[in-house]
Amino acid sequence: QTHESAKTLGLVDQVAYEDQYHAAIKKKLGLASTDTYEAISVLDYAETNATTVSDFTAKSKIAIVYAQGDIGRGEGDVTTVGEGSMRRALQEARDDEAVKAIVLRVDSPGGDALTSELIWREIELTKKVKPVIVSMGNYAASGGYYIACNADRIFAENTTITGSIGVFGLLPNFSKLTNKMGIHAEQVATHQNAAEYSVFQPLTPAYAAYAQKGVERVYTTFLSRVAAGRKMTVDQVDSLAQGRVWSGADAKKIGLVDEIGGLHTAVAYAAKKTKTKTYATQNFPEYKRDFNAFLGQLGLPFFTSKEALLQEQVGVENYKLIQQLRKVQARKGIQAALPFDIQFH
């Protein structure tokens, strides 16, 4: 639409130049045309806490630790839950005397099982010092539930996808393909167990049994973590587990979550539990800001991220396939993750 038709259709309120825009704001604020007004950037505004009404003069704080995205090894970033950033965030919140309670905001379909276990351990240590309350977003499944299950209280939305208590492992093998192509690879070792698993060699029954044993061991540990956190027997958890996916509403009925409510509700509960009347909230972890990527996400045409360029070049469907391949490539070791994507229509 042109700017004139956009106004006619009610998509915008007024067509104006930048100086007219500033003049309108001054008029709205009751300022003279020669006055100036304070403004903040969209980037700074996005980083301010908008989750609850905070008293920034208060000495007490409620920490909100965000665990968003696939769980993987390494540091992590705004789109992935990394061991390094999560453990450091929990340690900082735990050691800060001004922080009275911690709300762990989980929005993750899971991922690396070892990383999930290490984050679980950090939460267990934190609980000994101050309360940990979980607020589930769209997803808190598999590894996402793993890191949530031992919280003092778990809140979920009615539509949260949770549960998926199960694990799996991936062993890609190209031996048949390479044989057809006439490509042969050989390993030289002192004994049959000395060499690493090779994607170019047929999977032996012994190695398959070894891998299966590892998956079962991690699954048993997963069940025990949930049983301890939710005060159930392992058999009770197993009857709800085996990869089953539950909505937040159903998860409450079967005891996997405690209450239905959003982040506001979880923060309010944390404050009430610690008898904290006035408080500010503080977000963890802190990540470096990618200015260009942020503006690209806002849809500004002159700031385009590398991902947006790739999507434009290969098309939406091919881009989705590339993303799936990236996920598979990033999965190393045993996984506590949703083995599929859920789309809402």
What kind of region is each of these model predictions?
Residues Q1-A24, S175, N179-A270, T274, ...:
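Charged, glycine-interspersed solvent-exposed loop segments at helix/strand-loop junctions
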Residues Q1-K61, R73-E75, R88:
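Flexible, low-complexity junctional segments that flank or bridge functional domains
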Residues L9, Y37, A58-I62, V99-A101, ...:
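Extracytoplasmic
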Residues S54-L177, E216:
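Cleft-lining beta-strand/loop regions that shape enzyme active-site pockets
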Residues T57-I62, Y66-E92, D96-E97, E286-H345:
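Intrinsic disorder and flexible/low-complexity segments
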Residues Y66-G69, V106-S108, M136-N138, A151, ...:
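Active-site proximal loops enriched in glycine and acidic residues that flank catalytic Cys/His/Asp
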Residues A113-L118, D250-K253, A293-L298:
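Short glycine/threonine-rich loop-to-helix capping motif typified by GTGT followed
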Residues A268-Q297:
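C-terminal intrinsically disordered, low-complexity extensions immediately downstream
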